[in-house]
Design a protein with these regions (language model features):
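Structured adenosyl-cofactor binding patch, chiefly the S-adenosyl-L-methionine
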Residues: 186-221
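Active-site/ligand-binding-proximal alpha/beta "capping" segment
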Residues: 157-200
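RNA substrate-binding interface of SAM-dependent RNA methyltransferases
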Residues: 69-158
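Fold-independent oxyanion-binding glycine-rich loops
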Residues: 15, 23-24, 46, 82, ...
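Short connector loops at helix/strand junctions that flank enzyme active sites
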Residues: 36, 50, 71-75, 98, ...
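N-terminal positively charged helical leader segments and presequences
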Residues: 1-68
Length: 221
């Protein structure tokens, strides 16, 4: 895996066996990053497969057979109530860097931000692009699934809800839900598979999301 970390660039492509860079990717690799002939560039399909390539002109050529990184036996999921402005993008970026497998956007009972179907389609498409960029920056090989918005009623039965005063996150926790800044309602806490604490202080949605993600990844590794 040291090749991934030390390559001159890491690019998300459709097929790692016959990688083709888009015009934007080629510009970034050869103009922005200034990758030179002979330098190693790694590629991934975002589904666990990656390959080392050699830069040649404005193309890249595989120099090894593709490698498959097996998925986790128990995928890690983080759901969060959609916060205001561009904070969902920042959250998705960080969750991708941390290595979360599934990201779920939530509409909770006390949510201030609610996306219509049309708006959700546009936002999720943008978040997928953010995740792709974060995967390349962090040298990851598994692109997270991004789903939603789901209602809290649909998601919470399969997740532990973050709630002050609850038990600490443990290795048994693989799915965490972060509520809105107004907190979960009593009904939502009843729907949840359990409750966990992400700290003793009052955290913003984005902070609580990253803290919980870091902890479940730490327990999984």
């Amino acid at each position: 895996m040291s090749v991934l970390r030390h390559a001159a660039a890491h690019v998300l492509v459709d097929d790692v066996a016959t990688p083709v860079l888009t015009d934007d990717q080629a510009h970034h690799v050869f103009r922005v990053l200034r990758v030179r002939d002979g330098e190693v560039v790694t590629v991934t399909d975002g589904r666990g497969r990656w390959c080392a390539c050699r830069a040649s002109g404005t193309d890249i050529e595989p120099i090894d057979a593709p490698t498959l990184v097996e998925p986790r036996r128990r995928p890690l999921t983080v759901g969060f109530a959609i916060p205001k402005q561009d904070r969902p993008e920042w959250i998705v970026q960080k969750l991708t860097e941390i290595g979360i497998d599934r990201i779920v956007l939530l509409h909770a009972e006390r949510s201030v931000v609610r996306w219509t179907a049309d708006r959700a389609t546009k936002h999720v498409a943008k978040l997928l692009r953010v995740a792709a960029e974060a995967l390349q920056q962090s040298r990851g090989v598994w692109l997270p699934a991004i789903e939603g918005p789901l209602t809290a009623a649909d998601f919470l039965p399969s997740a532990a809800a973050a709630e002050p005063g609850a038990r600490p996150i443990s290795a048994d926790d693989t799915s965490i839900a972060i509520g809105p800044e107004g907190g979960w309602t009593a009904d939502e806490l009843e729907w949840a598979a359990g409750t966990v604490s992400v700290g003793s202080t009052v955290l913003r949605v984005e902070t609580a999301t990253i803290v919980s993600a870091s902890r479940i990844v730490m327990h999984a590794e």
